[in-house]
């Protein structure tokens, strides 16, 4: 059995909360998986095993997946975690058994997944459970909008962002910590790096505004000062250099996995209106000052 990893878009009803879902199979030997910060949390459901939640990451998290394991997973957008009994800043860089957070419902879901006809059915069971949970749970629309406005394609200073959302910087930070797990500046840095990975995965052609090197061009396109700035951030977030992470290729990660489904909605935000228009629309929609 060969190792495989296949991403896809979530159910349309979950697209506002879930960035991607996937099915992963390991081969005859254990597989070393390097999880990177994405700004969101993840749920991992090894079929026949114990489901886990991976909290918001601020650096690389290395996991050894046992041989002959089949796993289905869900990656959430920033600020759009599934209903949990705690704030997300308590879960930063943590890996927890889902039963600790969801109680018996996690165990029942794990049993249903273990008895599923296959991983496709197991993934449907997970998405169905999430859909039921999100229908009865609320989200913080301000933080969701802040996360969109922190995308690298329209860089903004955090103080200006708070002003445009009609709250103080301390309020913005507190609400981000509770619902994203990290402050807005950390989220902005994470999303900028995700933007670089998205461009690399898509095989984007750099603008060439600085230097002839492809990495340097993409670095500037996504908001880094130069390639050295990108390299420092890549080492901090992944523990690897950009070239090592990409495996020497500009259109895939070093592990060979195709993450197009994960980055497709991310790249779509490049066509959003300028920040000034977005913030004005959001503030006009809020009749009172949020606290």
Stretch-by-stretch model annotation:
Residues 1-169, 179-184, 198-225, 241-291:
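Alpha-helical bundle regulatory/interaction domains
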């Amino acid at each position: 059995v060969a190792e495989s990893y296949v991403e896809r878009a979530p159910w349309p009803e979950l697209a506002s909360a879930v960035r991607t879902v996937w099915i992963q199979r390991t081969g005859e030997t254990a597989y070393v998986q390097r999880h990177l910060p994405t700004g969101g949390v993840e749920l991992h459901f090894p079929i026949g095993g114990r489901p886990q939640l991976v909290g918001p990451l601020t650096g690389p998290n290395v996991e050894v997946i046992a041989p002959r394991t089949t796993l289905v997973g869900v990656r959430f957008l920033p600020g759009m975690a599934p209903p949990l009994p705690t704030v997300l800043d308590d879960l930063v860089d943590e890996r927890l058994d889902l039963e600790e957070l969801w109680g018996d419902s996690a165990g029942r879901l794990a049993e249903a997944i273990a008895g599923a006809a296959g991983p496709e059915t197991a993934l449907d069971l997970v998405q169905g459970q999430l859909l039921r949970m999100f229908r009865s749970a609320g989200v913080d629309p301000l933080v969701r909008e802040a996360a969109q406005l922190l995308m690298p394609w329209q860089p903004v200073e955090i103080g200006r962002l708070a002003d445009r959302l009609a709250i103080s910087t301390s309020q913005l930070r507190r609400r981000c910590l509770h619902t994203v797990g990290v402050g807005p500046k950390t989220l902005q840095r994470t999303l900028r790096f995700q933007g670089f990975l998205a461009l690399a995965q898509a095989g984007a052609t750099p603008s060439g505004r600085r230097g002839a090197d492809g990495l340097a061009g993409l670095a500037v396109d996504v908001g880094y000062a130069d390639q050295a700035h990108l390299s420092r951030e890549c080492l901090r977030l992944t523990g690897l250099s950009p070239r090592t992470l990409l495996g020497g290729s500009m259109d895939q990660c070093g592990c060979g996995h195709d993450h197009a489904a994960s980055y497709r909605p991310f790249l779509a935000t490049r066509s959003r209106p300028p920040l000034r228009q977005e913030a004005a629309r959001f503030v006009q929609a809020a009749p009172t000052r949020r606290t």
